[in-house]
């Protein structure tokens, strides 16, 4: 079974680029859309997004870091969204040999020296000039990244 995105999600994936902001309402499927973009950036097959059989990405895909709210990290919302992509933070369940980390904005400084990975920044917190912004700027220079936001 494939991933099965809605048409508007496929349209969004096709418009996305490194460094973009994906804006959508609460419950609009931004997380799954972001994972679909990651899937395609790592040699995933577009037909899998339309509901065709899942075709694995090249192995290993880039390490994936998801920086989100502490609540979303603790409730494992992202874990559920990763299931159709056969991704998991648990190496025994993850189909691939890449590293996947889901952490909160409070810990973003731990990742400022990561390079050649893919970051999804959920719930935009990169305005201003504080430590989160400084860490984000360092991460953005050495990695692929996208931002998800429910606020315009």
Model-based region annotation:
Residues 31-38, 46-83:
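Conserved Walker A/P-loop ATP-binding site and its immediately adjacent core
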Residues 84-113:
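Inter-Walker segment of RecA-like/P-loop motor cores
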